[in-house]
A protein has these predicted regions:
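Non-catalytic terminal/accessory segments
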Residues: 1-469
Length: 469
C-alpha cells in the first residue's frame, strides 16, 4: 500500500487578518525602539543609532505600521504613482508588508515619481508634487520611522514644521513670546522652491548615515520624474509628495539657527530664528541686526543649493511702519503691535506699562482664500439639496475656525459669516425666482433664541457659524 503526503495550500489571507492585528501592541513595540534611537542620538552614540535603526527596519511591527500609514492612515493614500495603484485591499496590504523584508528590499529598485500639478491657494500658478509608487511609499514610511527619532534628538529648538508634536500654533506662540515684552525688527523670508533645489550631495553628507541606508535614500532622490509619460532625471531636490520628503527637507535646513546665532557677538544680542518648513522669520531688536542676519543666511543657504525669494523677503517692524507696512504675516496670521494708552497697554515682567499691545489675527490673504474656498463649495452645489450643501460647507468652516481659535479672530469670523450669508441668500433666491425674500428666508433659515438666524435644512442639519468658535 503506497502512502502519499498531502500538499496543503497556503492559508488565504483575509480582511479579518489585517483588522485583527494587535495595532496598539505593534505601536508600543516600535515606539520603544524609537525611544532607544532617540536616546542613543542624544548621547552621540552613532554606532548604537545605526544598529537600532537596522533593528527597527527589520521589525515586522514597523513594516506593518509603514504599510498602514500609506494605505490607510495617510490623506494621500488614494493618489497613484506611475504604477496606477491607488489603494490596496487588506490581503494585498499584507503582501506589501512581505515586500518590505530586507531580502526583498535589496532586490527592488526605486521607481520614478509621477508628477502631479496642484493649484496654489489663491494663486494662478500650480505646485508640482512627485508621487512615488506604493511600494516605495511604504519603504519610505519604514525608513522614516527609523531616521526621524535620530534627528528629533538633534533638531534645533525653533524648527516647527513637519515634526511630531509640533505645529503652526507652536511657531506662532514662540514668536509671541519673543515680541510680547519688546518690539522687534523682523526678516520675513521665504526660500525659493526649497523642495526642488536642495543639493543631493549636501543633504546626503548632512544625513551621514550608514552606507546601505545612504544608498537607499540616494536612489529615491535620483529616481527621476514621469510627467505625462515623459521621463526627466533629477539632479537636485526632494519631490514633494514622498513620505520622507518633509523630513529630508528639515535635515537639509538643520543648522540654520546655529549659523545665524554664531554670526553675532554677545554684545550685539543674539537673534531668534523661527522656522516652519521653508518659511522662517528672524527677530532682532535693531535694524542693523536684521540686515546682518540677511547677510549671514544667504551664503549658508547657498551651501545646500538654496536661495531666498526676493519677492517674498522683506524687513518689517512689529510696532512701527516700514515702507508703509507694520507687522508681518506668517502661517496665515498677521502679527502686529499697536500703540495704546495706559488703559489697554500690556505690562512687562516688573509691572511697568509697555505702551503697546500685541495682536495676532487671521491675515487678509487667509481670509480671501477661505472666502474663495467657501464660494467654490456653494457654486458647486447650486442645484444640490440644502442638507448636502450644509454637509460640504461645515467641514470647511469648522477647519478654518478651529485653526484661528487661539488668536484674535472675532471680527474676521463675523466678516466671513456676513459674506457667506449674502452668498447663501443668493443661492436660495435663484432657486425660487418667483418667491418673495420673506418666503425664501422662512424656507431656508430658522430663528434660534440663543444663536439667532440659522441656515437649517428640513432634516435638522444646521450650518456652523464661525462666530461660535
Amino acid at each position: 500500500m503506497s502512502s502519499s503526503k498531502e500538499t496543503k495550500a497556503p492559508p488565504t489571507r483575509t480582511s479579518e487578518d489585517w483588522a485583527m492585528l494587535p495595532w496598539r501592541k505593534l505601536e508600543r513595540h516600535v515606539y520603544r525602539l524609537q525611544k532607544r534611537i532617540y536616546r542613543a542620538s542624544e548621547r552621540g552614540n552613532v554606532q548604537a543609532v545605526h544598529r537600532l535603526q537596522q533593528l527597527l527596519m527589520r521589525s515586522r511591527a514597523a513594516q506593518l505600521l509603514a504599510v498602514r500609514r500609506v494605505t490607510q492612515d495617510n490623506r494621500g493614500k488614494k493618489t497613484a504613482g506611475i504604477d496606477g495603484v491607488k489603494s490596496l485591499a487588506p490581503p494585498a496590504r499584507l503582501a506589501l508588508v512581505d515586500a518590505l523584508h530586507p531580502t526583498h528590499v535589496k532586490r527592488s529598485k526605486a521607481r520614478p515619481v509621477r508628477r502631479v500639478w496642484i493649484p496654489k491657494p489663491g494663486k494662478p500658478e500650480k505646485r508640482p508634487l512627485g508621487i512615488p509608487v506604493l511600494r516605495d511609499r511604504a519603504h519610505q514610511a519604514l525608513v522614516k520611522q527609523a531616521v526621524e527619532p535620530e534627528w528629533e534628538a538633534r533638531f534645533e529648538r525653533h524648527s516647527y514644521g513637519f515634526r511630531p508634536g509640533r505645529g503652526c500654533h507652536d511657531a506662532i506662540e514662540a514668536i509671541f513670546g519673543v515680541i510680547k515684552q519688546k518690539p522687534k525688527y523682523v526678516l520675513d523670508a521665504d526660500i525659493a522652491q526649497c523642495f526642488d533645489h536642495i543639493s543631493h550631495h549636501a543633504l546626503l553628507n548632512k544625513l551621514a548615515t550608514y552606507p546601505a541606508l545612504r544608498q537607499t535614500i540616494r536612489a529615491w532622490l535620483k529616481a527621476g520624474v514621469m510627467d505625462a509619460g515623459v521621463f526627466t532625471p533629477i539632479e537636485e531636490g526632494t519631490p514633494q509628495g514622498g513620505v520622507i520628503s518633509p523630513l529630508l527637507a528639515n535635515i537639509a535646513l538643520h543648522g540654520m539657527e546655529a549659523a545665524i546665532r554664531d554670526a553675532y557677538t554677545v554684545r550685539e544680542g543674539k537673534p531668534t530664528l523661527i522656522r516652519y518648513a521653508d518659511d522662517f522669520v528672524i527677530l532682532h531688536p535693531t535694524h542693523a541686526g536684521i540686515e546682518k542676519a540677511k547677510e549671514a543666511i544667504e551664503p549658508w543657504l547657498q551651501t545646500i543649493g538654496l536661495e531666498l525669494k526676493p519677492s517674498k523677503t522683506r524687513i518689517a517692524h512689529t510696532l512701527y511702519p516700514l515702507q508703509g507696512e507694520t507687522g508681518f504675516d506668517f502661517l496665515g496670521m498677521t502679527i502686529r503691535q499697536y500703540p495704546v494708552g495706559r488703559t489697554h497697554s500690556g505690562r512687562d515682567t516688573y509691572g511697568r506699562l509697555l505702551g503697546f499691545k500685541t495682536l495676532i489675527k487671521p491675515s487678509e490673504d487667509a481670509i480671501k482664500r477661505h472666502v474663495r474656498a467657501v464660494g467654490q463649495v456653494v457654486r458647486k452645489h447650486q442645484t444640490a439639496p440644502q442638507a448636502a450643501l450644509i454637509e460640504h460647507l461645515n467641514p470647511v468652516i469648522r477647519g478654518w475656525a478651529a485653526y484661528y481659535r487661539t488668536v484674535v479672530a472675532k471680527d474676521s469670523y463675523a466678516r466671513c459669516d456676513d459674506w457667506l450669508y449674502s452668498k447663501l441668500r443668493y443661492w436660495a433666491r435663484r432657486r425660487h425666482r418667483n418667491k418673495s425674500l420673506r418666503w425664501v428666508s422662512r424656507k431656508y433659515w430658522a430663528f434660534d433664541e440663543g444663536a439667532g438666524w440659522l441656515f437649517r435644512a428640513s432634516d435638522g442639519s444646521v450650518l456652523t457659524k464661525q462666530t461660535k468658535h
